[in-house]
Swiss-Prot record:
The lineage of its organism: Bacteria, Bacillati, Bacillota, Bacilli, Bacillales. This is Glutamyl-tRNA reductase. One of its GO terms (biological process) is protoporphyrinogen IX biosynthetic process. GO terms for molecular function: glutamyl-tRNA reductase activity; NADP binding. The active site is at C50. The keyword Chloroplast does not apply. Keywords: NADP, Oxidoreductase, Porphyrin biosynthesis. It comes from Staphylococcus aureus (strain NCTC 8325 / PS 47). Homodimer.
């Protein structure tokens, strides 16, 4: 069995392509089932977000499995197989494990160290598990990856430093006010950066937010989407008299907030602080306003300095997390190597205990007068003899797990003790056959 990961992400495909290869939430369960029923696939998890669509699979053969996954994606999104090959990257074995660990911990995200992907991986795994497309390997591996990512974030604080301009804008406001929950905010503009700033303000606890824009319809649309207030741009001077935070991001060719405007409203504001954050280029807010008492004016260069410093902190944290990944891969490989040994040890124990049970039956027939206490003593000691006899063979079997010729030697081990253990590959195939029948039955029932 082999682990393979096929990924379409922000490095391999531009946004125009990624938009075309995203599974809708309501289609993911069926997609899991369709892929699972495909030849060569023994286990699978599908991850689909705005920045990546990935298939993780346990396959019986690498080349066959890779082809059928690529064909599945091509059919799902209306592409040719060669198109999918061109827009994706393929990881196999240890590289696939490393990829999963990096994705889950946010090291492979557009925003380094972001935590949203951890929840998305967890949801994808839980969906696959509930659908029935995971088995022994993925049930262990994905739990390991999720645990690793949680620990990495807790130990390094990689997600604690803002690395987007809109998020950094809110962080600057926090430096002035501390908690923002009771503050009033104005968003000038209704584009993408304005919406991101609005979302970050909402995330900080602020609820009193007003969107203003030259085109009132756009302000109305953005405000309705996030359930905040809106107003005309001409109302800005009046709004500034009671505002605490202003974030401006428009494409205006002249200043929207001028020195004269701020000087006029400053008289009515008494000594209340006002934070003006200009993330527009060209600038929306006239330079020099910071000279007015209790007025804090920041532009994109101020934000860039904060973002750059925070990014360096995240990169240091990412390096620390990356150093831990080889240990996780080794732990996974150790666990995998034991999969072939466990059934052999189980078969050996079962045979030994069957011999002990036969021996006790023989003793019962030949010594029918034994008391229950005497019988328990004999049973206990015969089991003890068996455990002592099995101690060294079991130890040897475990050591075979790390041997390059473990399969051959485990087969010899079984021949010596005249036992027969089912290999993990056969178990996985039988498990798949059973689950495919369940999926088919579920679909028939759903159709009826």
């Amino acid at each position: 069995m082999h682990f393979i990961a096929i990924s379409i992400n922000h490095r391999t495909a531009d946004v125009a392509l990624r938009e075309q290869v995203t599974f809708r939430d309501d289609a993911l369960r069926i997609a899991h089932e369709d892929l699972y029923e495909t030849k060569s696939i023994l286990e699978n998890v599908i991850l689909s977000t705005c920045n990546r669509t990935e298939v993780y699979a346990v396959v019986d053969q690498i080349h066959t499995g890779r082809y059928y996954i690529q064909r599945f994606l091509a059919r799902a999104f209306g592409f040719e197989v060669d198109d999918i090959k061109a827009m994706s990257e393929v990881k196999v074995g240890d590289e696939a494990v490393e990829h999963l660990l990096r994705v889950t911990s946010g090291l492979d995200s557009i925003v380094l160290g972001e935590t949203q992907i951890l929840g998305q991986i967890r949801d994808a795994f839980f969906l696959a598990q509930s659908t029935g497309t995971t088995g022994t390997i993925f049930n262990h591996l994905f739990k390991q990856a999720i645990t690793f990512a949680k620990r990495a974030h807790n130990e390094t604080d990689i997600a604690d430093n803002a690395v987007s301009v809109s998020y950094a804008a809110v962080e600057l406001a926090k430096k002035v006010f501390g908690k923002l929950k009771s503050k009033q905010a104005i968003i000038i503009g209704a584009g993408e950066m304005s919406e991101l700033s609005l979302l970050n303000l909402l995330g900080s606890g602020i609820t009193d937010i007003t969107v203003v824009n030259r085109t009132i319809e756009n302000a109305m649309k953005l405000a309705a989407k996030h359930q905040v207030k809106y107003d005309e741009l001409s109302s800005l001077p009046n709004l500034l008299e009671s505002a605490d935070i202003v974030i401006s991001s428009t494409s205006a060719q002249s200043y929207i907030i001028t020195n004269e405007m701020i000087e006029r409203i400053a008289e009515n504001r008494k000594q209340d602080s006002l934070v003006l954050i200009d993330i527009a280029v060209p600038r929306d807010i006239e330079p020099g306003i910071s000279a007015i008492t209790n007025i804090f004016n920041y532009d994109v260069d101020d934000l860039k300095g904060l973002v750059d410093a925070n990014l360096r902190e995240r990169q240091l944290a990412a390096a620390t997390i990356s150093e831990q990944i080889p240990t996780e891969i080794h732990a996974h490989n150790e666990w995998i190597s034991m999969l072939g040994v466990v059934p052999v040890i189980r078969a050996l124990r079962e045979k030994a205990m069957a011999i002990q049970a036969e021996t006790m039956d023989s003793i019962d027939r030949k010594l029918p007068g034994l008391s229950e206490r005497e019988r328990k003593i004999i049973s206990k000691h015969t089991k003890s003899i068996i455990n002592q006899m099995l101690k060294d063979p079991i130890k040897q079997a475990k050591e075979l797990s790390s041997d390059k010729k473990s399969n051959e030697k485990l087969e010899l081990f079984q021949n010596i003790f005249d036992i027969e253990a089912e290999c993990p590959h056969e178990q996985a195939k039988q498990q798949k056959e059973s689950k495919v029948k369940e999926i088919s039955a579920r679909r028939i029932f759903s159709f009826e």
